[in-house]
């Protein structure tokens, strides 16, 4: 649905809202329609891979609410490293069980509609390699934010509201909902000082070249 929404946006009758590249293609904030569809496709995959893999928020908040945090901390294993290792294990499982099937369906569906060559205009081995490395770094950033925010359960006594607040802020500021290029320039300058862009936006742009 989001893909077709952007398709409608790029096909408005008012040509004055667009820029044009050297090939005469319509652009919004330096994104052509195929580039935007590609960004959305990659975003769906990376959000599943990153957001669906981190379990630190749930684990920490549950340990705090159930009073098990003290027992976890005195065990002869680093609590933070154990949580991060769990997230990496989940990331590996998510990649094979969810990401590969979703990617296949997306490629076949959107590629048949908009054209395979246009969607994957800049994929090459080094973009994929550095994109994979950036995805690992993204998981570390996101998992660390999960770990820090979950500790607020000490003061709130409940975690559901914290989870909704965290999810809303991160999805909005990470480029998961819309590319950060569509934000005002002053907002982009502010967001660049925050870690959120490194979760979704930067890995996506690396993959796109």
List where the protein language model places each region.
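Transmembrane helix-boundary elements of multi-pass transport/secretion proteins
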Residues: 2-48, 52
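Transmembrane alpha-helix termini and helix-breaking/packing motifs in multi-pass membrane transporters
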Residues: 3-12, 24, 100-119, 182, ...
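Membrane-spanning helices that line or support transport/gating and their immediate boundary helices
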Residues: 8, 56-63, 68, 144-151, ...
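Residue-level signature of transmembrane alpha-helical entry/exit and packing/kink sites
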Residues: 32-39, 123, 127, 131, ...
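Hydrophobic alpha-helical transmembrane segments of multi-pass membrane transport proteins
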Residues: 36-103
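Transmembrane alpha-helical segments that form the membrane-embedded catalytic/substrate-channel core
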Residues: 45-56, 136-151, 172-177
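Alpha-helical transmembrane segments and their short interhelical loops
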Residues: 91-159, 163
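Transmembrane helix segments
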Residues: 112, 147-207
């Amino acid at each position: 649905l989001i893909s077709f929404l952007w398709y409608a946006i790029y096909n408005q009758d008012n040509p004055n809202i667009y820029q044009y590249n050297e090939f005469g293609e319509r652009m919004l904030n330096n994104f052509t329609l195929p580039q935007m569809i590609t960004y959305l496709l990659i975003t769906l995959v990376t959000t599943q891979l990153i957001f669906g893999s981190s379990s630190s928020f749930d684990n920490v908040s549950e340990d705090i609410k159930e009073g098990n945090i003290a027992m976890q901390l005195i065990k002869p294993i680093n609590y933070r490293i154990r949580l991060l290792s769990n997230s990496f294990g989940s990331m590996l499982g998510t990649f094979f069980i969810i990401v590969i099937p979703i990617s296949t369906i997306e490629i076949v569906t959107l590629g048949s509609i908009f054209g395979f060559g246009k969607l994957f205009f800049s994929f090459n081995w080094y973009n994929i390699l550095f994109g994979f490395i950036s995805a690992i770094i993204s998981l570390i950033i996101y998992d660390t934010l999960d770990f820090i925010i979950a500790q607020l359960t000490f003061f709130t006594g409940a975690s559901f509201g914290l989870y909704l607040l965290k999810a809303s802020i991160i999805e909005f500021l990470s480029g998961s909902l819309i590319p950060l290029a569509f934000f005002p320039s002053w907002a982009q300058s502010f967001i660049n000082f925050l870690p959120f862009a490194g979760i979704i936006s930067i890995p996506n742009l690396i993959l796109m070249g």
